[in-house]
């Protein structure tokens, strides 16, 4: 099969078309602006898979309809998924704009006095607004000289934020969500909404019964040599935690080995179902070798699978991590309990940062008073106003232990192309594999248990669907918190201590849902959330606006909120603008 190419960024230099001196005097400056933009983006950005970002520049500057059409023809042939129009001068507004209705687009109008780049920017944005095709405005804060080829810091920030979000939009389009199973324990997020995926994300849903996973395992539709490699890797790297089951439910060595074997097979088969595997064609399984073109997946598990077979905890944890028996590699996006809406939040976070994601229950709010009563410990520092216990048996990537290190030696989660094998090994060494609790998982399994290091910046997100409104996005920036070991042990043993934990302290604003930590917990829209490394809420906001998903809750500084220019015409309060604009324009891929 022909490999699907990655989306590219189109750069559109537009120019005043008047010959006999005007256009000629601007050609070099305008094209250099396009080249500088392309150089910035290719230097600073990568696709989530680690591949370099490519920019495609129009063959000529664009002065009118003919050159705009020629540019569009070139872009259409090269899989351009988003565009940035650049100019230092006046040009002819609606004659030169990008008219593709679903392609994210921005315009950078140079802030200079010699030629009115800002005037074109305003005229072009007015045309976009009038035609119902929103575009992002980029305009430097300070005036630059005409011969200044540098890109100011504020312009660079907007170019990169737009491009990150636009690449996420383009990368999701045309892919699928693999729904492996159905609704898990009545969890609304696992009632997979095909219209949401199709209309807002441009994706399809591939619904597959869990018996397909059973069939692949039982009929050996996998690479048997790879299974042996996976088992050897687990034997070398897995540390096992205590078995907290009653004696009658504890498994002997042979039974435990069978559970481990099937857990690793589940990871292999789910991966093959998502992306395909040419090795399957070699054993005569050509249809299965193709996969389902899935950029994200979810596994129902509970209870129709887990009452009889090993749970998905090991498979999900390994797939979501940036490494396995094949070494360091791109993480997959697999939502536990087939919570497709949390899966979408994971997908967004992964596309924006290139990193693995932490799937968790938003389990418990611990007030400072409650912790002091139970443990005698008085919270301070980042945790002084209370903390939220994020914990779940399944999809937390092992990267979430934060045993990787940034350039300053601080704990973090890095994109896979920056992770060393030593850092991957450190994450494995920080993880224990605990036998699943029989009362919950009768078929057995192993849950990963680790504790996220403290002081790490995170952004917690969640997508919810509201009847009559559609999808909404929640965002809470904050930090992981490290508690004294004895305090952690006391709190952790009050719940399921065989699962991975992140203690999370959201950044408070003193207003609305961020009045206090309790309010964050009380306003969270579902039982699950996702942690993405870094304070990247602004990127999520920009991405959501491209997809026309309003943000119902966030604690991002107002100066960092970046949405299409037309949002400003939808009222004076920026969050109300977001709702009205998203309702006005409707989902990006209207159906």
UniProtKB/Swiss-Prot annotation:
Pfam families: Fucose_iso_C (PF02952), Fucose_iso_N1 (PF07881), Fucose_iso_N2 (PF07882). Its main location: cytoplasm. GO terms for molecular function: arabinose isomerase activity; L-fucose isomerase activity; manganese ion binding. SUPFAM superfamilies: FucI/AraA C-terminal domain-like, FucI/AraA N-terminal and middle domains. Pathway: Carbohydrate degradation; L-fucose degradation; L-lactaldehyde and glycerone phosphate from L-fucose: step 1/3. The active site is at residues 337, 361. The keyword Isomerase applies. This is L-fucose isomerase.
């Amino acid at each position: 099969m022909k490999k699907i190419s990655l989306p590219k960024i189109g750069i559109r230099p537009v120019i005043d078309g008047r010959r006999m001196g005007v256009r000629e005097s601007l050609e070099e400056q305008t094209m250099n602006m396009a080249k500088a933009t392309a150089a910035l983006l290719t230097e600073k950005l990568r696709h989530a898979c680690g591949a370099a970002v490519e920019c495609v520049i129009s063959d000529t500057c664009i002065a009118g309809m003919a050159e705009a059409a020629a540019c569009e023809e070139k872009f259409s042939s090269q899989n351009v998924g988003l565009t940035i129009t650049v100019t230092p001068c006046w040009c002819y507004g609606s004659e030169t704009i990008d008219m593709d209705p679903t392609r994210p687009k921005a315009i950078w109008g140079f802030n200079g006095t010699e030629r009115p780049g800002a005037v074109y920017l305003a005229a072009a944005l007015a045309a976009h607004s009038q035609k119902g095709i929103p575009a992002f405005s980029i305009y430097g804060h300070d005036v630059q000289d005409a011969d200044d080829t540098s890109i100011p810091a504020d312009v660079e920030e907007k170019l990169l934020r737009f491009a990150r979000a636009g690449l996420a939009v383009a990368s999701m389009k045309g892919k699928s969500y693999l729904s492996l199973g159905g609704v898990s324990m009545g969890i609304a997020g696992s009632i997979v909404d095909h219209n949401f995926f199709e209309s807002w994300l441009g994706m399809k849903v591939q619904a597959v019964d869990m018996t397909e996973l059973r069939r692949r395992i039982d009929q050996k539709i996998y690479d048997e040599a790879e299974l042996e490699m996976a088992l050897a890797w687990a034997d070398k790297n897995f540390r096992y935690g205590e078995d907290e089951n009653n004696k009658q439910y504890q498994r002997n060595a042979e039974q435990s080995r069978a559970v481990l074997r099937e857990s690793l097979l589940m990871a292999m088969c789910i991966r093959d179902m998502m992306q395909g595997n040419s090795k399957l064609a070699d054993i005569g399984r050509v249809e299965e070798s193709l996969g389902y073109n899935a950029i994200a997946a979810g596994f129902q598990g509970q209870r129709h699978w887990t009452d009889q077979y090993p749970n998905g905890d090991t498979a999900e944890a390994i797939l979501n991590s940036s490494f396995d028996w094949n070494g360091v590699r791109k993480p997959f996006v697999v939502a536990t309990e087939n919570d497709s809406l949390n899966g979408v939040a994971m997908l967004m976070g992964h596309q924006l940062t290139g990193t693995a994601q932490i799937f968790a229950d938003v389990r418990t709010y611990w007030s400072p008073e409650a912790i002091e009563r139970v443990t005698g410990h008085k919270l301070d520092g980042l945790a002084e106003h209370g903390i939220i216990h994020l914990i779940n048996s399944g999809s937390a990537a092992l990267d979430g232990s934060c045993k990787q290190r940034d350039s300053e030696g601080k704990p973090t989660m890095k994109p896979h192309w920056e992770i060393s094998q030593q850092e991957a090994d450190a994450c494995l060494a920080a993880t224990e594999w605990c036998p699943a609790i029989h009362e919950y998982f009768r078929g057995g399994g192993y849950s990963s248990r680790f504790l996220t290091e403290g002081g790490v910046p995170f952004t917690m997100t969640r997508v919810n669907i509201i009847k009559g409104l559609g999808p909404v996005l929640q965002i809470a920036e904050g930090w992981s918190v490290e508690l004294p070991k004895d305090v952690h042990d006391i709190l952790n043993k009050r719940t399921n201590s065989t699962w991975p934990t992140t203690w999370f302290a959201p950044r408070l604003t003193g207003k609305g849902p961020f009045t206090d930590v309790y309010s964050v917990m009380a306003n969270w829209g579902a039982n699950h959330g996702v942690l993405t490394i870094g304070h990247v809420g602004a990127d999520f906001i920009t991405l959501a606006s491209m997809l026309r998903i309003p943000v119902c809750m966030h604690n991002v500084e107002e100066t960092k909120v970046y949405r299409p220019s037309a949002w400003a015409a939808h009222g004076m309060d920026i969050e109300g603008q977001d709702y009205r604009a998203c309702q006005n324009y409707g989902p990006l891929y209207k159906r």
